[in-house]
Amino acid sequence: MRRITLLLLSIFLAWGAMASVTDVKIIYKVEVDGWTSANPNTHFGGITLTCNDVAKSVNLTPRNLDANEMNIDLSGNVSISFTRKYRGFDFVGFSIGKTDLGQAPTLTAKQKKQMKKGTPLVAKFKTDGSKDVTLFYDDDPKAYRIPAIATTGTGRIVAVSDYRHSLDDIGRDVHRTGSMRIDLVARTSDDNGATWSQPQTIAQGDDNQVGSYLRAFGDATMAAYGTNILVMAAAGDVIYPGGTAENPNRMARIYSTDNGQTWQIEEMTRKVYVEANSLIPDGVSSFFGSGKLAVDPDFNGTGKARVYGAVLIKNAERTDNNYVVYSDDLGANWNILGGSQTPVAFASEPKVDILPNGQILLSARRQGGRTFNIFTYTDKATNSGIWDSAVNGCENGGKNGTDGEVLCIDAWKADRTPVKLLLQSQPKGGASHYDRRDVTIWYKEVSTDTNYTSTDIANGWTQGKQLSTQESSYSAMCLQQDGNVAFFFEEAPCYGDDYTKGYCMVYLCLSVEEITEGKYSQR
């Protein structure tokens, strides 16, 4: 395998304007077996050097190929440790000269003397052979969050993330950055996730647009069909809990009709809620549940695509309710599914998908699991139908209230019987709202011949593949052209290890066999 000697980069901690009188100049390098510039993963890991209880951390990337010099105190006990793992690489250990030091050495006097004379300290890595790709690295004081993903009719995968100059949700600046700007950035793949484009900003926030929907764009949800791509996003500078009829949080439509080459943006706030003639007139705050919109490419045999979205609405009484809305014109206009019926009350960020029999599934975030409800059409020609009663379920999710995704896919049983599988992703975590870790997919069989109740959907889930063993949170998924599942989610590490700010945004290509751990196969 090719070995490339690379340099440690990105010193995260401020080390002071002047070096200590006991500091000496040393050289750091990193060696990575199997890495080439064609590899989309560009962060290898992080290490920490500790001397006299003073820790200095560096992040390892291929951005600088020349040797770096660093001033550090070697007068006391010096220990070195591997402290930051990224997808795509395994840490091997440290070395000085021809001496391997292991993975967590304390330097001897001889080794410190070698370093003082210019012998490099080398951190060694190797590629792990996986196809996992980190699309956005959170190693900058501007944070990435909130995954959204869709596949167009040409097979192009489009992955979108918040790029948070504010380090926070829309309408907040608790970290005192002086900014409320959030951009939406995208990367695309035309070969089922093997390679990816460079990042593209599809909606750029502007701090000069105070009070306008143009100040920030975030919490995107996506749909695609043909060469059309629709993104619905929260917008502006009013945080969701603070919205009022006079000053609601904003909503934006961002769309492309040329497979993502160009994008248009328009405000949708008062089309969806607030106004007397809007979709939900008593709403004072709203946004679409992030991740994936559901698409029926040929609704009721009309030849037209119908897009379904799940929205969270805070009404004038400050109650949070979930609704499903639909659009037959790429999000330009929306209608509410089920009229005045409220599918889910007192819940949070919702997701939607279409069951094999045409029923519409609403899956909402709540503390302690998920809340499910089912809409059944009685007459598609008139868009008539009825919602079941909402049912809470916890077999398929973590104990904390965190966003997850729902998706229906094709599969084979072991006896080659064709089936449909319903997938639900969620962190397992723990009881705390912020104990977000161990993102996992649950699954269950669903049939084209069965009309389901909410209780049917809430029960009978099987835990599938656990995708992360560390801090991990929101997730989205869609079907790729090759039949695999494109899974896009938030995972450690993040800048400053503060997960209230951001995460790395990781893409995984998952087969049915992987998701179900061999119990079903792909068809």
Residue locations for each model-derived region?
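Short coil/turn motif common to extracellular beta-sandwich-like domains
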Residues: V21-K25, D73-S79
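Positively charged n-region of N-terminal signal peptides that target proteins for export
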Residues: M1-I4
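Surface-exposed interfaces of beta-sheet-rich extracellular modules
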Residues: S75-T106
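Asp-box/BNR beta-propeller blade signature and adjacent active/binding-site loops
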Residues: D128-R523
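Bacterial N-terminal signal peptides
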Residues: L7-G16
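Conserved "repeat-terminator" motif of extracellular CCP/Sushi domains
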Residues: T22-V30, R84, A104-G129
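Short, ordered, surface-exposed loop/turn motifs in non-cytosolic proteins
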Residues: G34-L60
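Tryptophan-paired
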Residues: T50-G76
